[in-house]
Design a protein with these regions (language model features):
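Intrinsic low-complexity, intrinsically disordered segments enriched in polar/basic residues
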Residues: 3, 20-21
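Short N-terminal leader segment in a subset of presequences, especially plant chloroplast
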Residues: 8-12, 30
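Hydrophobic h-region of N-terminal signal peptides that target proteins for export
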Residues: 13-19
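Surface-exposed, well-ordered secondary-structure segments
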Residues: 21-175
């Protein structure tokens, strides 16, 4: 029996189940999106939504921008949130979702399965649960930023994230 055939089938199934990461490289550099806009990327839609500041006030005056500074740690383009949230319209339900991020100031918002959190940064979410989903944050903090990756593990039926000076890349859903 040929042992490589079953292995290649397993690899193909793993690639299919893991879905495609949204890397934003199909977006025009420096494009700006205001609250209420939709971003079509990687065959998916991302809605740009209002943002909640640390004091609880909601703002609709922010914007998103396609950036290529590499702060989030991915390659090519990334999305920058300036007082906005990104509502990812993915093929739910998911069993896992990962993303790379950079926080250069201000607070962050995250919502998983309609469980909304407004936090000073993502470090405090490590080893917690949001919306019944386990959260793991691996990040490095220095004087001016926090850069890392968040892993959401569990039944995911909705995902929104954003910040004030926040970059995101390589949003990878797993069904």
């Amino acid at each position: 029996m040929n042992a490589t055939k079953p292995l290649s089938m397993v690899a193909a199934v793993a690639i299919f189940l893991s879905g495609c990461c949204l890397k934003f490289n199909d977006l025009a550099p420096d494009t700006t999106y205001n609250v209420g806009s939709t971003i079509a990327t990687g065959g998916k839609t991302v809605k740009v939504e209002q943002f909640q500041w640390a004091n609880g006030t909601w703002s609709s005056t922010g914007h998103a921008k396609v950036d290529s500074v590499g702060y989030a740690g991915g390659s090519g383009s990334e999305l920058r949130a300036n007082n906005v949230n990104f509502n990812f319209q993915l093929d739910y339900p998911l069993s896992k979702l990962t993303f790379k991020f950079a926080d250069y100031g201000g607070n962050e918002n995250i919502k998983v399965n309609n469980d909304f959190r407004n936090v000073s940064n993502f470090l405090g979410l490590n080893n917690t649960t949001i919306g019944g989903v386990n959260v793991t944050v691996t990040a490095v903090q220095n004087v001016s930023s926090i850069r890392g990756e968040m892993v959401l593990q569990g039944p995911i039926n909705g995902f929104t994230v954003g910040g004030q000076e926040f970059w995101i890349d390589e949003v990878c859903p797993t069904e």
